[in-house]
């Protein structure tokens, strides 16, 4: 019989499983690892950000981190800062060095600053990288479009992931809305370029409106799907929406929602799909700021960055979001997963573009920790650090029961193994019953036949009077679970 990896059943849908009683969703645990890269040099002064950026495994087994800094003191005036992109390297995903790249010198010494050939203005914000093939890397970032100086998504290509050259003639791929609160007005740009303001504004307004995005965006490439970008999108926040905020913060007239665009070449992007919009289950002042995404076990897993805009609540955190197709997303728990645990991330958590990074039996989540809330920038104390948490693999979201016995039934599944295993933390007890697809008990696999289990186990085997489920291999079944004081994360079948 062909050996194959077990299938994984997660509980990532919007609603609890069928026939649920006395159970609830519960986030999995995280271990805080603290700051891993800090802005302690002139080139990343006070700000080492991984927001939207990524880590890549290289052919020699080492790791390359792309990050960026708002505080880079790389101008002629040593007190003037300019956002720039940088590189760090590691052998273990946790301890990082800042290598001399030989591209940009400060005070006569090499640095880990990246130089992008052909970039008109050396400004790099919100960089997001993809590796298209072994010798084809692409570096997306936000900066000033050539000539117009509009705030735009730009791109550069490289053969080795270190030496990049601008593509598309420095023209923007997507644009930040040209609003007084968000960037330069098109007509003002036209006047500076000595174009006819009315003609220029019409042509460019249509282009910018069609390609509207936000600089909180992450780009991905997959050989089968092509290019995707998940980005924040601003929609007009009308008074009748009930979501207008009457306190100062940036862009009060707009509501931030999440959008996705697709492209065959990563340069020419289609129209956006609005994929996550605040609804009746969300707080009245909910906004979404970004969403890194990764693939796992047939799911698209998103770390949805959200914050509330009412005064005193603008601390950015992440919640979990899940999708099968990238368009329709479930959000089982409407609230943040974890908070900062250090002074460096007390003001908010902005996840890196990888979402979940495989590290054996666990995942790492890298993020930018900030010490102030979204609406406050204290230039004296303002810092950004690349921080990390560790998450046990498969333990993202559980169906949990507390001090009253809970139960639920799984969807029909085809068993691909002789044994059914579960990943669970059981302080009380758990038992299970095997059923047909209509929910009828299967002989010899009743609740009272089950060998009750407890403890913390990632591979606890389900047995009934010592017998497994080999006779039902490649047949459809459902499983009814009863549990007390326990969290069930995953079924392996």
What are these regions (language model features)?
Residues 1-286, 295-347, 367-493:
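Beta-rich carbohydrate-recognition and catalytic domains
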């Amino acid at each position: 019989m062909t050996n194959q990896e077990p299938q994984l059943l997660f509980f990532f849908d919007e609603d609890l499983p069928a026939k649920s009683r006395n159970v609830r969703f519960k986030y999995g645990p995280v271990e805080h690892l603290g700051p891993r890269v800090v802005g302690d040099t002139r080139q990343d002064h006070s700000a080492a950000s991984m927001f939207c950026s990524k880590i890549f495994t290289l052919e020699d087994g080492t790791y390359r981190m792309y990050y960026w800094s708002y505080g880079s003191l790389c101008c002629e005036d040593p007190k003037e800062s300019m956002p720039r992109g940088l590189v760090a390297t590691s052998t273990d995903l946790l301890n990082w060095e800042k290598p001399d790249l030989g591209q940009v010198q400060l005070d006569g010494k090499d640095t880990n600053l990246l130089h992008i050939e052909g970039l008109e203005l050396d400004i790099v914000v919100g960089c997001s990288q993809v590796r298209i093939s072994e010798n084809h890397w692409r570096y997306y970032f936000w900066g000033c479009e050539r000539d117009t100086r509009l705030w735009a998504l730009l791109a550069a290509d490289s053969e080795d992931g270190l030496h990049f050259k601008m593509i598309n003639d420095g023209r923007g791929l997507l644009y930040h809305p040209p609003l007084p609160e968000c960037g330069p007005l098109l007509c003002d740009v036209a006047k500076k370029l000595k174009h006819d303001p009315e003609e220029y504004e019409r042509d460019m307004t249509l282009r910018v409106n069609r390609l509207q995005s936000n600089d909180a965006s992450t780009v991905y490439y997959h050989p089968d799907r092509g290019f995707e970008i998940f980005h924040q999108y601003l929609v007009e926040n009308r008074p009748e929406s009930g979501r207008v905020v009457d306190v100062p913060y940036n862009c009060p007239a707009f509501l931030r929602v999440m959008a996705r665009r697709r492209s065959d070449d990563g340069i020419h992007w289609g129209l956006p799909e609005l994929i996550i919009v605040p609804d009746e289950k969300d707080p009245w002042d909910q906004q979404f700021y970004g969403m890194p995404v990764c693939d796992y076990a047939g799911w698209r897993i998103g770390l949805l960055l959200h914050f509330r805009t009412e005064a005193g609540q603008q601390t950015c955190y992440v919640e979990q979001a899940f999708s099968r197709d990238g368009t329709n997303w479930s959000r089982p728990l409407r609230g943040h997963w974890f908070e900062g645990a250090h002074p460096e991330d007390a003001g908010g958590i902005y996840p890196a573009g990888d979402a979940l990074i495989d590290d054996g039996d666990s995942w790492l989540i890298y993020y930018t920790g900030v010490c102030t809330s979204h609406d406050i920038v204290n230039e004296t104390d303002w810092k950004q650090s690349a921080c990390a948490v560790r998450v046990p693999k498969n333990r993202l979201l559980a169906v949990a029961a507390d001090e009253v016995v809970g139960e639920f039934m799984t969807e029909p599944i085809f068993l691909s193994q002789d044994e059914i295993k579960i990943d669970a933390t059981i302080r009380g007890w758990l038992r299970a019953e095997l059923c047909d697809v209509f929910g009828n008990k299967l002989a010899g696999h009743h609740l009272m036949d089950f060998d009750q289990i407890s403890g913390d186990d990632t591979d606890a085997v389900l047995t009934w009077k010592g017998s497994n489920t080999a006779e039902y291999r490649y047949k459809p079944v459902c499983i009814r679970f009863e549990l007390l004081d326990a969290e069930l994360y995953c079924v392996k079948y």
